[in-house]
Amino acid sequence: GEILLRLSPPDNERIVRGETFQKQVGGAELNLASGVSLLGLRSGIISRIPDSSIGMFAKNKIRFCGVSDDYLVYDTGKDARLGVYYYENGAYPRKPGVVYDRQHSSMTRIDIDEFDDSIYESTRCFHTSGITLALSEECRKTGVEMIKRFKEKGALISFDVNFRLNLWSGEEARKCIEGILPYVDIFFCSEDTARLTFGKEGNVKEIMESFAAEYPISVIASTQRTVLSPKIHNFTSVIYDAKAKKFYEEKPYENIEVVDRIGSGDAYCSGVLYGLLREDGGCASALRYGNASSAAKNTIPGDMPSLDREEIENIIHDHETVGYHSEMNR
């Protein structure tokens, strides 16, 4: 997936008025790989970045998060660039805002021949998202072919629709994604996206069942976020085990104090994948780790999560326990 440079005015300052920006790194697939690494699994990011000081900044952040940089390729061209986006926080009644500057980034010119065939070996799970497929024709071709090659070598395929209207239309997304769904094992799609992109009808459970009936997907996950204000959210999700034909749900995390919601969906995916891939994993575990990881990420500035497995398990314990909770970890 694409690695992005994020620039944000501090606190609640506005892009149109602020004079300084905080520099951070993110991107859907990197956010997920970072979350999985924090929870205890080995992860790496496949991407293309500029061979420059900005690219080195991104590489250093990747390493700091415990994510392998062995699968990066470097763009040495004069027009090499890292995609950029600007983000400002919201406060009721003003919504958060995003401005993208990612066209013609190094990632948009990715080519599958830049990667050695050894990357397809010994991988338990390959994850990508609709954002990556929407970036360019080169990204789409490379992403689809990698899905097929990883699947052929025995990896589970995880896919997050992550629909972005500013990147492609619902019809473009539907045509492309329906072509890869026969290869997908773990599918992340919100109820709203299922209706907008795939024309699905019915409630969320009926929508999930319809995907499982049409494609050989094993696990389908759908987040459910209630935005009370830019700073206060409720969050939970539904996971469907298509083989057992069983739904998994839990009570929502309520009144989450949102510091930064960017990346919370990716944190959810990382928790779900950890819950499925851990030694005693399954959908029940995926639900607990996914919901807790997403809820917790909302409280962390920047795109990437910053809580390890012990901290997430403490959050899960408090969420499931009635009665006294310590107000501080000490």
Language-model regions: role of each:
Residues 14-34:
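Short catalytic helix/loop segments, enriched in acidic residues and glycine
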Residues 252-319, 323-330:
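Conserved post-catalytic alpha-helical subdomain immediately downstream of the catalytic base
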Residues 1-14:
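Positively charged, low-complexity intrinsically disordered leader regions
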Residues 150-156, 215-218:
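A short helix->loop->beta-strand "cap" motif at the edges of active sites that frequently abuts
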Residues 31-43, 64, 275-279:
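Alpha-helix C-terminal capping segments
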Residues 42-130, 312-330:
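Conserved N-terminal subdomain of the carbohydrate kinase-like
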Residues 167-244:
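Conserved phosphate/ATP/ADP-binding segment of small-molecule kinases
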